[in-house]
Amino acid sequence: MSIAEKIRNIAADARQAAIAMAKLSASAKNELLLAMAGSLVRNTVQLIEENRKDLEAGEAKGLSTAMLDRLMLNEARIKAMADGLREVAALSDPVGEVTRMWTRPNGLRVGKMRIPLGVIGIIYEARPNVTADAAALCLKSGNSVILRGGSEAIHSNLAIARILGEELKRAGIPAAALSVVPFPEREGVLEMLKQEEFIDLIIPRGGESLIRFVVENSRIPVIKHYKGVCHVFVDADADFDMAEKIIVNGKVQRPGVCNALETLLVHKDIAETFIPRIAETLIELKVELRGDDCVRQFVPQATKATEDDWHAEYLELILAVRVVDDLDEAVAHINRYGSLHTEAIVTRDYHNAQRFIREVNSSTVLVNASTRFADGNQLGLGAEIGISTTKLHSFGPMGLEDLTTTKFIVYGDGQVRP
């Protein structure tokens, strides 16, 4: 059987399993996830053995130390995966929730009820923990899931899926509710992206090149975010101490994540006093500054910023800095160069804060808080499947609710249309 035929069979089986998943009660799904968590811990030795195969292959290929670290499973990381499953089990189940109900003049009662999407495909890179995390979220929201992880983690991913799949069987749920594409070749991804008959949604998790590849080759709707070009605007009346804390946290705490700060905008009225202060702090923290001409008047050691810098997601200790005339120019800059991810304003002016919230066209907008809060857990969603910077079907950090859709439900007592 060819790869194309095998992928089609996996997708068709997942579609059938989705019918069974949609019928499960919240308690049945929670019991399943708790059983899966326990099974991961019990099989720690087996998982580490399978993961060692990936690590040895990665070392032979010359993978970087950082990549090998992302790939590695140990006892603590397996326990963390299990804890993640337990946390998802503790979340409220969105399936079956009636979000609105109203009565028509003819007596019909109309409502909208949350239902699973169906079959979700997750395409990701060399992070075995995503196999368990993504599976938990999809299953809890009543969906089937097809996982295609990076080829570097093929042994780890298959082992995790096999362990979780055994618990599906014990619970009397079709094992096809959780599948892993077992082919490391790119052909496996391409064939998966053709299965629009069976797969309802694709969620890619990884770098910009992976996401663009998926978008360009998929026949299935894709939830995506290419990159996180996140901004902080320091308004004219901002509290300097607060602004400094927010900027340092956004840039320095974890510079390699998508909600890290990449561009700082400073109101011209405070540039002369605030920019030297924040520059001194950031330079002490080993941050490279790239500024416009005005910034470089106050910080001569800053590199001259180019047009590319305003578009850049650095993911390292580099920060682009620009002086703007007012709120209008700050908003215009963000809406031109931003990636619809996360933006923040530091201000004491309520009117300016409200304007910033309304006019900035991004999925998460903060007032007097760090961009690092653009995260499902931090925003109270529980676990997160990813962050979307497209407005269909979801926008911003995605939790369980975002893995559902709604259908209309209508109650009558014999009404017919005149």
UniProtKB/Swiss-Prot annotation:
Pathway: Amino-acid biosynthesis; L-proline biosynthesis; L-glutamate 5-semialdehyde from L-glutamate: step 2/2. InterPro entries: Ald_DH/histidinol_DH (IPR016161), Ald_DH_C (IPR016163), Ald_DH_N (IPR016162), Aldehyde_DH_dom (IPR015590), G-glutamylP_reductase_CS (IPR020593), Glu-5-SA_DH (IPR012134), GPR_dom (IPR000965). GO terms for cellular component: cytoplasm. It holds the Pfam family Aldedh. It comes from the Bacteria. It is found in: Cytoplasm. GO terms for biological process: L-proline biosynthetic process. Its EC number is 1.2.1.41. GO terms for molecular function: glutamate-5-semialdehyde dehydrogenase activity; NADP binding. Keywords: Amino-acid biosynthesis, Cytoplasm, NADP, Oxidoreductase, Proline biosynthesis. It catalyses: L-glutamate 5-semialdehyde + phosphate + NADP(+) = L-glutamyl 5-phosphate + NADPH + H(+). Belongs to the gamma-glutamyl phosphate reductase family. Catalyzes the NADPH-dependent reduction of L-glutamate 5-phosphate into L-glutamate 5-semialdehyde and phosphate. The product spontaneously undergoes cyclization to form 1-pyrroline-5-carboxylate. This is Gamma-glutamyl phosphate reductase. It comes from Geobacter sulfurreducens (strain ATCC 51573 / DSM 12127 / PCA). The lineage of its organism: Bacteria, Pseudomonadati, Thermodesulfobacteriota, Desulfuromonadia, Geobacterales.
